[in-house]
């Protein structure tokens, strides 16, 4: 018995003896290559992006509970109403003024099942909903009455989008893009790539750009499809990147976070350790740089800001891809053993004194606030504890800032 026990413990004994024991085990923060500054260029947080009226005390405001269970998608704000989708496939309409759920409707026949993915589109007084199943369901936004539903060929994990007044687009996990009539849900056109087999990667919500819709597949493809008939305008594949080979159906061939775009360009972080800039009209690569494990990106002022798993925030020149600013997002006192965490997309806030700052929120309840002065963006942020598990933020139609966890919604002051 003792011999058997010794044999079972042998691998652990060897590990502890060869310098690979607990003191040397590295996590994703240690393993992610760090970015370094490459150019000394100014950073402007100017007004070509949304500027949010923000101070940290907003996060102490009243909390609303608009969902019956844990939310799995970003809330939708229409007037006084908040529409939410929860893990049990309940869609709820919550009145802010009355501080209560006005109606709630369960989308699934399996009420005890948990769902992930999907989202809500509000379009022409209706709610188009996907919830991590094969169904697209349409409800009347005012009453919650089900109008129509359609079963698609496979599971849908991203929210529907409107291509125009009469066309809704959905995308399945098996790389099928389907355009549907917004009234009848009849298929108008579809496009299909190789079915994904193995992937845990981020799924990009399609982007409508001029007469095209930009879609990505987990086979490592980015395509521009004509919104009227689904014709392929251009097709870019990650296998075209010059020093890597992307393997279809594996995460190295996929995107890591929400891409960002302006009127002419698309920026995509890939599992190949590449950040690429594509021309939206042609699909051609304008530049590519080495940048591993990117969590989030944002075009702000004259910079492309990225956050990676090394707990760094960096500012890049969007024209060249060169790094002009890097700062650490460290909170723990023992910086030698930083834990991995999730960061939201950076945003610019302006306080009551009209002072602008760059802000980064982590889901573990830390705000990193970078001030800017005549010398540029400061390297060392103010670090402030806030509520945990903030997943979304943005502006409502009345320009009120909101923050949302998976349970609560908090509102800031108006502009």
Curated annotation (Swiss-Prot):
Tell me which Gene3D superfamilies the record gives.
YVTN repeat-like/Quinoprotein amine dehydrogenase (2.130.10.10)
Q: Which domain of life is it from?
A: Bacteria
Membrane-traversing stretches: none
Protein name per Swiss-Prot or TrEMBL: Uncharacterized protein RP232
């Amino acid at each position: 018995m003792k011999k058997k026990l010794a044999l079972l413990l042998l691998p652990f004994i060897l590990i502890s003896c060869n310098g690979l024991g607990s003191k040397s085990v590295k996590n994703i923060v240690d393993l992610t290559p760090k970015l370094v500054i490459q150019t000394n260029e100014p950073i402007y947080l100017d007004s070509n992006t949304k500027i949010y009226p923000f101070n940290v005390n907003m996060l102490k405001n009243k909390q609303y509970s608009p969902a019956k269970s844990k939310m799995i998608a970003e809330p939708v704000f229409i007037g006084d109403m908040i529409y939410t989708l929860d893990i049990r496939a309940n869609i709820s309409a919550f009145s802010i003024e009355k501080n209560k759920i006005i109606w709630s409707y369960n989308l699934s026949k399996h009420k005890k099942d948990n769902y992930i993915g999907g989202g809500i589109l509000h379009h022409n007084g209706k709610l188009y909903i996907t919830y991590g199943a094969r169904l697209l369901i349409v409800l009347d936004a005012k009453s919650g009455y089900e109008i129509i539903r359609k079963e698609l060929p496979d599971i849908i994990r991203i929210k529907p989008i409107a291509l125009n007044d009469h066309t809704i687009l959905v995308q399945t996990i098996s790389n099928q893009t389907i355009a549907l009539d917004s009234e009848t849900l009849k298929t108008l056109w579809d496009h299909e790539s190789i079915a994904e087999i193995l992937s845990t990667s981020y799924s990009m919500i399609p982007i409508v750009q001029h007469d095209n819709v930009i879609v990505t597949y987990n086979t490592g493809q980015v395509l521009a499809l004509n919104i009227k008939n689904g014709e392929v305008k251009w097709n870019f594949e990650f296998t075209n990147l010059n020093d890597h080979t992307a393997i279809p159906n594996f995460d190295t061939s996929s995107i890591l976070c929400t891409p960002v775009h302006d009127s002419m360009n698309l920026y995509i972080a890939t599992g190949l350790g590449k950040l690429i800039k594509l021309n939206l009209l042609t699909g051609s690569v304008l530049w590519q740089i080495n940048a591993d494990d990117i969590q989030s990106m944002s075009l702000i002022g004259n910079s492309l800001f990225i956050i990676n798993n090394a707990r760094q925030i960096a500012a890049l020149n969007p024209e060249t891809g060169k790094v002009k600013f890097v700062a650490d997002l460290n909170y723990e006192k023992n910086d030698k053993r930083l834990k991995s965490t999730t960061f939201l997309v950076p945003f610019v806030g302006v306080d009551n004194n009209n002072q602008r700052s760059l802000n980064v929120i982590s889901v573990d309840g830390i705000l990193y606030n970078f001030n800017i002065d005549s010398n540029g963006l400061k390297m060392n942020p103010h670090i402030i504890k806030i509520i945990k598990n903030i997943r979304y933020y943005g502006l409502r139609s009345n320009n009120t800032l909101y923050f949302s966890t998976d349970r609560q919604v908090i509102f800031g002051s108006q502009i």
